[in-house]
Amino acid sequence: KGAIGLAGRESLENLIFVVNCNLQRLDGPVRGNHKIIQELEREFRGSGWNVIKVIWGRLWDPILARDKKGLLQELMDKVVDGELQNFKAKGGAYTREKFFGQNKEVLEMVDDLSDEDIYKLNRGGHDPYKVYAAYHKAVNTKGAPTVILALTTKGYGTGSREADNTTHQVKKLTIENLKSFRDRFDIPVNDDELEKLPYIKFDSSSKEQKYLMETRQKLGGFLPARKFQDIALKKPDSELFGKYFSGSDG
């Protein structure tokens, strides 16, 4: 609290914090029967920070557009961390019943969505458009530091391990999990190569490779290095210390 209070008092507008709220312990803040994002929001706002919450991805936008009475928004506002984790861990049918099913009118908003569609409703921290918008707002905020509170899913993209508490214990993904990960993110690796976990190399003329090279140059090269400059100091004239030498017999 002392550190964030200092940043707020000094109006450190170039300071941006990002808190990954993945709702599981060990490496993510969580309040099973409460809401860590709102808790952090209070702390930072009270210390003079600009707070940006990136909670719901853009796949929710069409559903929110139907929410003329604010009923879906009300459900979103009151859901606690433990429930949010379950909605990802237990699939679309569970989410339809336990989340949308709390209100008949809200349930009707997703009548045209399959259970798979509901499962794919994304969190804001995994939506590049929402993340970009948050960073854009953060870097253009003047007069105060900014914190981005991003809701994410533990084990995102790992298939059956996604949002599962046992994700913490997983050291290696199975071949099926790797295939699921590859297919989900459209990674150009065929089945024969998958077990070797090859590095992905972009073509030298691709926009991705050009971006990486340009960024490396801006950062000063591929490997960080500490540069030391030796400065030779001129020895003072011994006459300056004459009285000290004579007082100690030389």
Regions found by a protein language model. Name each.
Residues 2-18:
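A short alpha/beta connector and helix-capping loop motif
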Residues 16-18, 22-250:
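Conserved acidic/glycine
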